[in-house]
């Protein structure tokens, strides 16, 4: 599973770099990873989830929120003709906004929730 996940991230990064013509573009700089972290934090701290199965709640939320970020970026391109630099700047803004929200949730989280959030954000496969 780890190999498939790593390969998917590599392909996603390569596609983003090719589409925007910038070798510095990645899921991190476009805010996709931060959107996923926000979704996971919502599932862990606020227990808000789009699915009722508690084992899939974190993953489903992370996936949904990363798709929301991708949708925002795609809509930016449909809105008007924008440069690759604008995509990157919007992605960086999304990264900081999502990071601020996650940090606020960490402040109000219990010790068990903090532990689970840290465990997930470090890349746990379980």
Where are these regions (language model features)?
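Alpha-helical transmembrane segments in inner-membrane proteins
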Residues: 1-126
